[in-house]
Amino acid sequence: MKKFVSLLLAMLMVLSLVACGGDGGQSNTNSGDKVIKIGVFEPLSGDSASGGKKEVLGMQYANSETPTVELNGETYKVELVLSDNGSSTDKAPSAASDLVSKGVSLVLGTYGSGAAMAGGPKFGEAGIAAIGVTCTNPNVTAGNDYYFRICFLDNFQSAVLSNFAKDKFAAKTAYCLGENGNEYDQGLISYFTKVFEAAGGTVITDSFPTNNSDFTTYLNKAKSSGADVIFTPVSIAYATQIIQQASSLGIDIPFIGSDTLDDNKVLAAAQGTNIQLYVSTFYQEGGSPEFDKGIKDYINNNASAKSDNGGDDTISAVTAMGYDAYYVALEA
């Protein structure tokens, strides 16, 4: 099992938040404390819950580190208000509306581009800025003047991964597998295909139905087709099953995954096997010793945090991104 770190492009964000310049999202508690509410729009249940909880973990750690903010000469307590979008495009709009009704100043999230696109219009209609943390599909912010992001885009990471397949493995044929109808999966596969084919390669694409758990047919097809690499930008749950089943089948084709596969559950599935797994990532443990020590201490001294992190103190890239997003929000 191997990892590589793709370049993270610095992105300029110019935010003009009514909430931070007026009364939106500000309130007084019973104790008299002034409060600013930051909405957390994340999947706490469903297929993307593992990633969503880890993204929230970074925000919660940052909030514990810096629980107040100075605004117009006054100190405000920062309160994180969570709303579960259920990893679902159907549930995302109501989860977004819930945050709007609770009077948040701005919103962080969500993990999962599909849910971000489904819920985003609610924030735009309310005039509340949302900061995407790891929702990489370009369509998340397209046409929505209130949705921003701090992460790289899918067209960028797909190009990096496609070129990596060519440069590392001299790949001529790529087998691409994603969930049918999933905006994130299919968007990445589309971008990957364009770059790979433009370089003279051949792409074989397949889609599996939602809630599928047996990937044997797809993996055997990848092998019989003579694929040099397998590109599967899927959810943590699907990726874990695919890696485990590929190991059982003795698949020796290198796997290339997007940012979602940089997760301790997926990486653990590949450890101790002959699976070659390469992923793109926002952050790799060791990048900031100070952050690494702080978040590990936080996880190991908080049973709930450790559970949300999958039971260990491995630092997920999305946790680092959640941490950064919180501080971007405070600076907005």
Feature map (PLM): residue ranges:
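An alpha-beta-alpha
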Residues: 147-210, 229
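Periplasmic-binding protein-like
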Residues: 40-42, 99-111, 131-133, 175-178, ...
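Beta-alpha junction/loop-to-helix N-cap segments that form part of ligand/metal-binding clefts
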Residues: 24-29, 50-55, 69-141, 150, ...
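Extracellular/periplasmic periplasmic-binding protein-like sensory domains
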Residues: 246-323
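Extracytoplasmic "Venus flytrap"
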Residues: 32, 39-60, 83-89, 111-114, ...
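Short, low-complexity disordered leader/linker segments with a strong preference
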Residues: 1-37, 71-72, 101
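Short, solvent-exposed amphipathic alpha-helices that sit
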Residues: 51-68, 91, 130, 157-160, ...
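Extracellular glycoside hydrolase catalytic/binding regions
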Residues: 126-163, 279-284
